[in-house]
């Protein structure tokens, strides 16, 4: 009876997942795999595969998201560790509230605020105060993704460090290891799960973000993946073929993203399992 109650508690979650994720994804897959207005599936996918627009935008988003993850991890890891070791609860609450501002404030307001600040700083340096749209280049898009998505790396690491058993570090120090060795051999392996969670929460939103490049990069030379799909979707209001191509672009991007995730997360585990079984097989003979 107790187990059945747990299943009932999971019902709202599965209901929301079905309405807002499974059904839309099923519609996207069906739209991407059916012909539109007499055009075959190959004709619908040909502009995506033969042209460089999709792959250029995917590559731009990929390197921006990878650099965002690296910068966010390098900043958040030591910061969260030392913050979790602080005994001042008021200080920790204040720092957490400041660090997580980009999460609980409006996405659009954050972009407008960052754009205004950058225009002001660049205007002061160029003696062009009052001019707008002074941000040109993918570097500003990268700056925006770092600013917006670093808190998603911060929270998993901080919550994980708060439950780090202090006796592990003390035991390492009692064995004669210095602080750096203890940090590398104890703290980093302990936080592996939190790092993977933070990487996933930072990488995928940065990869598929839409409005950041439109707001912060006025050169429009390097279109991101989110903007590319958004443009196809806008054209889809008047053309069923463009709508189908937008769905196809989402499917291709999802497959490539899944391949990256599988290579980074699951493939090392599979290799480790196969390697261990091979060792056991060799020992048996």
From Swiss-Prot:
Annotated localization: Cell membrane
Give the function comment from the record.
Answer: Required for the activity of the bacterial transport system of putrescine and spermidine.
Output the InterPro entries linked to this UniProt entry.
MetI-like, MetI-like_sf
Query: Which organism is this protein's natural source?
Result: Mycoplasma genitalium (strain ATCC 33530 / DSM 19775 / NCTC 10195 / G37) (Mycoplasmoides genitalium)
Which GO biological process categories is it annotated with? transmembrane transport
According to the record, the segments passing through the membrane are 10-30, 62-82, 94-114, 136-156, 196-216, 247-267
PANTHER family of this UniProt entry?
A: INNER MEMBRANE ABC TRANSPORTER PERMEASE PROTEIN YDCU-RELATED, INNER MEMBRANE ABC TRANSPORTER PERMEASE PROTEIN YDCU-RELATED-RELATED
Protein known as: Spermidine/putrescine transport system permease protein PotB homolog
Listed A to Z, the keywords are: Cell membrane, Membrane, Transmembrane, Transmembrane helix, Transport
User: Which superkingdom is the protein from?
Assistant: Bacteria
Looking up SUPFAM superfamilies in the UniProt record yields: MetI-like
From the UniProt record, report the name of the gene that encodes this protein.
potB
Principal subcellular localisation of the protein: membrane
**A single Gene Ontology CC term:** plasma membrane
| PROSITE patterns membership | ABC_TM1
**Bilayer disposition of the protein:** Multi-pass membrane protein
What's this protein's family per the entry?
A: Belongs to the binding-protein-dependent transport system permease family. CysTW subfamily.
Q: In what residue span(s) does the ABC transmembrane type-1 domain sit? A: 58-268
């Amino acid at each position: 009876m107790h187990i059945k109650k747990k299943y009932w508690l999971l019902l709202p979650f599965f209901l929301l997942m079905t309405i807002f994720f499974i059904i839309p994804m099923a519609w996207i897959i069906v739209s991407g795999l059916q012909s539109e207005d007499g055009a075959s599936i190959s004709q619908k996918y040909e502009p995506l595969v033969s042209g460089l627009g999709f792959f250029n935008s995917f590559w731009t988003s990929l390197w921006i998201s990878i650099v965002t993850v690296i910068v966010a991890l390098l900043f958040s890891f030591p910061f969260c560790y030392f913050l979790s070791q602080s005994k001042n609860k008021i200080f920790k609450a204040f720092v957490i509230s400041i660090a997580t501002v980009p999460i609980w404030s409006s996405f659009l307001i954050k972009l407008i605020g960052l754009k205004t600040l950058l225009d002001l700083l660049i205007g002061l340096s160029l003696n062009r105060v009052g001019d707008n749209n002074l941000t040109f280049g993918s570097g500003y898009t990268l700056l925006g993704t770092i600013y917006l998505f670093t808190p998603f790396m911060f929270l998993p690491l901080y919550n994980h460090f708060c439950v780090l058993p202090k006796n592990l570090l003390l035991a390492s120090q009692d064995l004669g290891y210095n602080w750096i060795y203890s940090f590398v051999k104890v703290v980093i392996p302990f936080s592996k799960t939190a790092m993977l969670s933070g990487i996933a929460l930072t990488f995928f939103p940065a990869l598929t973000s839409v409005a950041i490049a439109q707001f912060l990069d006025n050169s429009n030379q390097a279109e991101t993946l989110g903007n590319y799909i958004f443009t196809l979707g806008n054209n889809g209001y008047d053309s069923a073929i463009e709508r189908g191509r937008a769905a196809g672009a989402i499917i291709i991007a999802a497959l490539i993203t899944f391949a990256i995730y599988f290579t980074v997360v699951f493939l090392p585990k599979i290799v480790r399992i196969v390697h261990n079984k091979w060792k056991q097989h060799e020992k048996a003979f």
